[in-house]
Amino acid sequence: MSVSAHPDDSEFYAGGTLAAFAARGAEVTLVVCTDGGRGGRGLEDMAGVRHKEQQRAASAIGIARVHTLGYLDGDLAPSDELRDSLIELIRQHRPEIILGHHPATFYVRYGNRVQLGHSDHRAAGTALLNAIYPRAGSPNFSPGQGGDPWYPREVWLFDCEEPDHRVSIGEGFESKLAALAEHESQQGVAGGLTKAARRVAALYGKDDEPAEGFVRLVLR
């Protein structure tokens, strides 16, 4: 399972890794917290457009299950409501590994460039960790979210300043780029995303092999 703030976040930060999981037969679920409605210009129904783009992008990396929670883009908060929605999905899908935003990223250095962190990313990451522990895995918490308690084996945090776990994505890199290209409303943004994805994959990689970086938390 990958939990992201916006459409295209999971593909940008972890698309190659997710493509590899799917290719190995894993049941991968994407959760997108916001509607992405402020992520572009010139389209009235930007949220609806981005929802369709996200479905196509997920298909490009072999993923059929996408949950869009529909929070307002730019105003995401680590609320009890968001936390409880994530608990419900974790218990429903019972993922062994959950990917999501690092909750404390205010900026990331990529070589000589600095990318400021998005407040929605931190909110999504905080809500995810609050959902995982102590609630999702305990019968004593959140009975209203239904399902049997579930505690993932690992959490991999992307969008991080200092990754300690790098995943080679040579086989999934083209699928990642194809997925990013499906976000057509972001052209100008998406073209930049593709270029940035190549640059970041090269920075994390070794011997010309592209990679993605995470902070890896082994929970059990």
Regions found by a protein language model. Name each.
Residues M1, R65, D80-R220:
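Metal-dependent de-N-acetylase/amidase catalytic core
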